[in-house]
């Protein structure tokens, strides 16, 4: 008689199972939060230093040379000489309106990406890193062309914040990316990306007034303002018109592009409500598969998440048996990627993964490994022993799990041990960012 193995505990056991190997420890989470706080505090301080210089210029007309000298005594000194001159020049040349806007500017912060979605996995291979994306948000008047406060000044001040911390911490490195500044800490297998956004000041202030009125009821945290070391935050109060959230670009003619990360966050939260809490787990497992198959590269996390949501929205599955659910996902992923994976954010100009007629070597490599995944899972399911089953399934997810006792003989169960998750039509993402 042919044996069939059940892998639910292999996937879900919080100690020895795959889930237990992927979830960050409390220490790792706290280290990321501490790093985030250090950067936020330094960013706030650098902006206060720059505003102090601008205030001195307003009070008594200072020469360019004096402004340069003042810049060199702040954390901005960690920029290059030419960048310091540029900061001094931009402050010196501000007109009265721009200076007043700058003096009233206080950066806000909002974490985005896998840390926020609770799908961040521990690194597996050398070179892979834990990452946290923490946006710096600048409440500014809505602009049609260029804002009063120059794009270059804002970028340079955020860079100065990061570079000053790099100068103070051995082993930290700064990297300039097109859409963010990055601090990389190789010894801790960690990096933090700091993108910068402009958001509409008037709308933000109205929301903040509402937040202040309800401060006693606020528990969660999305936007966080370190004013007197306080944290203010509320996912609904800080909903903003996505059309007016603009991401700063470092290079090129386009200085800003419309991009609101909360669209994707809301989409994923809504998907978890609609499909079930197991969605976060299977998305973690697919990212674990990716990290085991490629030391760098492979399909993006968001493309795996979007394809997985599409599958679980349309195929009935048993949330109480994630081994079977993963087989369903693996079976349908190749066709999802072959037709192309669209972004849940309608403002994205490109698909997350192109359709098959546009595939090059990279895409063909990804398709080949996607097509191999269901074969691996099927082979593991029909292995001759637990140890052989473990060896085979680890071909997909790496040798993270070593306890073969988590793999048990499949019992003769009805088609579904509980009512299957209903397959509903995927919901259209609202551009107005309704929180899930």
Curated annotation (Swiss-Prot):
Changing residue 109 to P: Abolishes enzyme activity. Induction: Expression is repressed by the transcriptional regulator VspR. Part of a CBASS operon consisting of capV-dncV-cap2-cap3. Disulfide bonds: none annotated. There is a cross-link at residue 436 (Glycyl lysine isopeptide (Gly-Lys) (interchain with K-? in acceptor proteins)). In bacteria expressing capV-cdnD-cap2, this protein is conjugated to a number of other proteins (by Cap2 via this protein's C-terminal Gly residue), many of which are involved in metabolism. More conjugated protein is found in the absence of Cap3. Its EC number is 2.7.7.-. Primed for activation by Cap2 which conjugates it to cellular proteins; priming is target protein-specific (green fluorescent protein does not activate the enzyme), but which protein(s) activate is unclear. Enzymatic activity of DncV is inhibited by folate-like molecules, such as 5-methyltetrahydrofolate di-glutamate and 5-methyltetrahydrofolate, suggesting the existence of a signaling pathway that links folate-like metabolism cofactors to the regulation of cyclic dinucleotide second messenger synthesis. Lacks a regulatory loop and is constitutively activated. InterPro entries: DncV-like_NTFase, DncV_C, GAMP_synthase. One of its GO terms (molecular function) is 3',3'-cyclic GMP-AMP synthase activity. Changing residue 137 to R: Abolishes enzyme activity. ATP binds at residues 182, 259. Changing residue 257 to R: No effect on enzyme activity. It catalyses: GTP + ATP = 3',3'-cGAMP + 2 diphosphate. Belongs to the CD-NTase family. A01 subfamily. Monomer. Interacts with Cap2 in the presence and absence of phage T2. A Cap2 dimer is bound on either side by a DncV monomer. This is Cyclic GMP-AMP synthase. The gene is dncV.
């Amino acid at each position: 008689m042919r044996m069939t193995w059940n892998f639910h505990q292999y996937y879900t056991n919080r100690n020895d199972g795959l889930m237990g190997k992927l979830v960050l420890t409390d220490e790792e989470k706290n280290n990321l939060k501490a790093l985030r706080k250090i950067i936020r505090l330094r960013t706030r301080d650098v902006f206060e230093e720059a505003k102090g210089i601008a205030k001195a210029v307003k009070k008594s007309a200072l020469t360019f040379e004096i402004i340069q000298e003042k810049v060199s005594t702040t954390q901005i000194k960690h920029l290059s000489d030419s960048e310091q001159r540029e900061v001094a020049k931009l402050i010196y040349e501000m007109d009265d309106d721009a200076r007043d806007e700058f003096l009233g500017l206080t950066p806000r912060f909002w974490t985005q990406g896998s840390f926020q979605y609770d799908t961040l996995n521990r690194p597996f291979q050398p070179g892979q890193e834990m990452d946290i994306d923490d946006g710096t948000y600048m409440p500014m008047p809505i602009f049609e062309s260029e804002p009063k406060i120059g794009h270059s000044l804002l970028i340079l001040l955020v860079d100065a914040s990061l570079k000053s911390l790099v100068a103070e911490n051995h082993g930290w490195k700064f990297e300039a990316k097109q859409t963010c500044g990055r601090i990389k800490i190789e010894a801790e297998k960690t990096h933090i990306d700091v993108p910068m956004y402009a958001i509409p000041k008037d709308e933000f202030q109205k929301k903040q007034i509402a937040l202040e009125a309800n401060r006693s009821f606020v528990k969660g945290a999305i936007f966080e303002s370190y004013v007197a070391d306080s944290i203010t935050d509320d996912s609904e109060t800080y909903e903003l018109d996505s059309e007016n959230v603009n991401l700063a670009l470092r290079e090129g003619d386009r200085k800003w592009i419309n991009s609101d990360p909360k669209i994707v966050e809301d989409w994923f939260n809504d998907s978890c409500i609609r499909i079930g809490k197991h969605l976060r787990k299977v998305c973690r497992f697919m990212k674990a598969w990716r990290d085991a198959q490629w030391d760098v590269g492979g399909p993006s996390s968001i493309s795996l998440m979007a394809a997985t949501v599409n599958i679980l929205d349309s195929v009935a599955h048993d949330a109480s048996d994630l081994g079977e659910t993963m087989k369903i996902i693996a079976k349908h992923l190749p066709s999802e990627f072959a037709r192309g994976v669209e972004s849940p954010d309608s403002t994205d100009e490109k698909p997350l993964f192109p359709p098959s007629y546009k595939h090059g070597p990279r895409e063909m490599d990804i398709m080949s490994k996607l097509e191999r995944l269901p074969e691996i899972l099927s082979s593991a399911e029909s292995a001759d022993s637990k140890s052989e089953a473990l060896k085979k399934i680890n071909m997909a997810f790496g040798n993270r799990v070593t306890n073969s006792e988590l793999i048990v003989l499949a019992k003769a169960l009805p088609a579904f041990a509980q009512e299957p998750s209903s397959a509903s039509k995927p919901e259209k993402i609202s551009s107005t960012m309704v929180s899930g």
